[in-house]
């Protein structure tokens, strides 16, 4: 029993004619989302970068060599506005972590790529994330973690189908 169960019982008491079974999982997911954001910020804080900025570096790294993407690909992949992405890219460029260059396949467009410093920082932060994640989730068995991941995948699919733009 936890505080969310207490909330659920209170709502059930106040609305006895309603099925409140969907309430606890949604509140837990919302709380988990907030805690995951805090966890991400704590992991990246020693590197003097925000979790959102790190997301850009990670997206470029995941793209594979030459670690470059169009800005539009970045904002779509990271679910950001084009204006927000422009601001982030400018900051990362000023920090020497990314650079822009003309897109050889589209004379009107540009590519954003990791600099050697950006690649090194991304690799260092990724390793920190892995270690912190493994430590955080160590109390869960591999089979439990796999089952939880599958349940979360199903929930995410429902939310994305229903609520994605």
Residue ranges and their predicted role:
Residues 1-47:
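N-terminal leader segment of winged-helix/HTH proteins
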Residues 20, 34, 38-81:
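N-terminal helix-turn-helix DNA-binding core of bacterial DNA-binding proteins
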Residues 90-150:
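Charged, amphipathic alpha-helical coiled-coil/dimerization segments
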Residues 39, 43-46, 128-140, 154, ...:
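Generic non-transmembrane alpha-helical segments
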Residues 28, 55-59, 120:
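Pre-recognition alpha-helix immediately N-terminal to the DNA-recognition helix
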Residues 1-17, 143-165:
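C-terminal regulatory/oligomerization modules of transcriptional regulators
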């Amino acid at each position: 029993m936890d505080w969310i169960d207490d909330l659920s019982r209170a709502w059930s008491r106040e609305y006895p004619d309603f099925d409140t079974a969907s309430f606890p999982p949604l509140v837990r997911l919302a709380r988990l989302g907030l805690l995951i954001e805090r966890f991400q910020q704590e992991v990246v804080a020693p590197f003097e970068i925000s979790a959102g900025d790190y997301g850009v570096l990670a997206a470029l790294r995941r793209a594979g060599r030459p670690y470059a993407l169009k800005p539009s690909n970045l904002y779509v992949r990271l679910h950001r506005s084009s204006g927000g992405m422009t601001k982030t890219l400018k900051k990362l460029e000023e920090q020497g972590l990314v650079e822009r260059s003309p897109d050889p396949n589209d004379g009107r467009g540009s590519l954003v790529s990791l600099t050697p410093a950006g690649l090194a920082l991304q690799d260092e932060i990724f390793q920190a994330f892995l270690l912190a994640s493994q430590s955080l989730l160590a109390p869960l068995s591999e089979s439990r973690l796999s089952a939880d991941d599958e349940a979360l995948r199903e929930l995410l699919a429902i939310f994305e189908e229903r609520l994605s733009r």
